[in-house]
Structures are given as C-alpha cells and as structure tokens.
Amino acid sequence: MASSSLFLLASLLVLASWQQAIAFDPSPLQDFCVADMASPVRVNGFPCKNPMNVTSDDFFNAAKFDMPRNTMNKVGSNVTNLNVINFPGLNTLGISLARIDYAPMGVNPPHVHPRATELLTVLEGTLYVGFVTSNPNRLFSKVVHKGDVFVFPKAMIHFQMNLDHNKPAVAQSALSSQNPGVITIASAIFGSTPPISDDVLVKAFQVEKKVIDWLKSQFSENNHY
C-alpha cells in the first residue's frame, strides 16, 4: 500500500514538472497583467500595470490587419507583428499575432521563433511553406491554399513563399508566446553586429572568402526582414 502511494505521489510530481516544463510563457497568476512599459523594473517579461488604472483600451489594438502592407523590399514580404511590445494587454497571456504580406513570388525568409509555435492560416493566395527539424535536418513542406492551416513547431527553422508570379498573397499567424522573438537565419549569420569572423564562415560554408564578403554586403544595411 505504501509503495502504491509513493508511486502515485511520484507520478503526480513528474506530471506537475512536465506541465511546468512545456509552458512557453509563465502562466498568469491573476485575471490579467497589462504590461507597464514605463516601469523601471526589469523582470523576465514585463511588470504589471496597476489594475486600478487598467481600462478597456488596454485590451484593444487598432491593428488594421485588413489593410495590405508594403512589400517593396529585397525579399518581397512584410510581417506586421502584434505582440506585447505594441499591445501591452497581451502580457502573461501567452499569445500573439502576425499578418504576413507577400509580393508575387515574395518570400518570408528562413527564420526561427525561439519562444513560440506558429499556426499559419492562408487568407489569400497559394504559398509554399515548410520547416526543417534539428539534425539530421528533415524538411517538412507543403503547398497551401486559401483557408489552409499549417503549423511550425517551436524553434524550428521555417519559411513561406508566394508561388504566384502575378498576384500577392496574405497569411495570418497565431503564436504561442506574448513575445515570440525572431531570428532571420541569413541576417543573423551575414549581418550580425559585430560581424562573425570570415574565417569561421569560410570554414563553415566551405566557400571562398570573396563569396562570404559578397553575402555580408547584402546584409550590411541591417535588412532584417
């Protein structure tokens, strides 16, 4: 009987630990915690605004997600993020949103959200989407159409491309963090500040230094799309 009770207790502790471990953002300990962006306090996240000063406007954002964005750039895409940085009411709620506009043949380059899973819905057009796993780097990709949904697991390198040569495309993503973060792979490698040593990149990519220099020149203006 004692051993059964001990096993049950151990199982409950493992379950509790597992539930805590899989939480991407800390769980809220109150009804809401609107971020106080003016507070000098620095914590893992943002401190709460005095709840007595919270209004309905703290839970509203005129994001204009129905409006097309400018995609006139090198990659032909534009990501509009709605997260705790520009929507403090999302603090501790573990969710954020993004609208992605694609020019004809536009690409949302390979990137990572280190703190979130992404659920993408195609609103207009046809996209080629995919993600790559950790080593040995298996690719999962699919052509998705208007109304289709595709999920990118947390911290996996992923991308999207508009397959239409003439028409723009639009998608909307829900992310499982108030502040997912983004690391655009090419920009991080070839446009970091300070730059990564050429010796490292020449050896890593097995190319000549002039190729590395050319690649770095493409990201010298902090084009972190």
Curated annotation (Swiss-Prot):
GO cellular component, one term: apoplast
More info: Member of the 12 germin-like protein gene cluster located on chromosome 8 in the major-effect quantitative trait loci (QTL) for fungal blast resistance. Partial suppression of the 12 germin-like protein genes increases susceptibility to the fungal pathogens causing rice blast and sheath blight diseases.
Name of this chain's protein: Germin-like protein 8-3
This protein's encoding gene: GER2
Every Cupin type-1 domain range: 60-213
Upper lineage: Eukaryota, Viridiplantae, Streptophyta, Embryophyta, Tracheophyta
Binding-site residues, Mn(2+): 111, 113, 118, 158
Organism: Oryza sativa subsp. japonica (Rice)
Extent of the signal sequence: 1-23
PANTHER family on file: GERMIN-LIKE PROTEIN SUBFAMILY 3 MEMBER 3
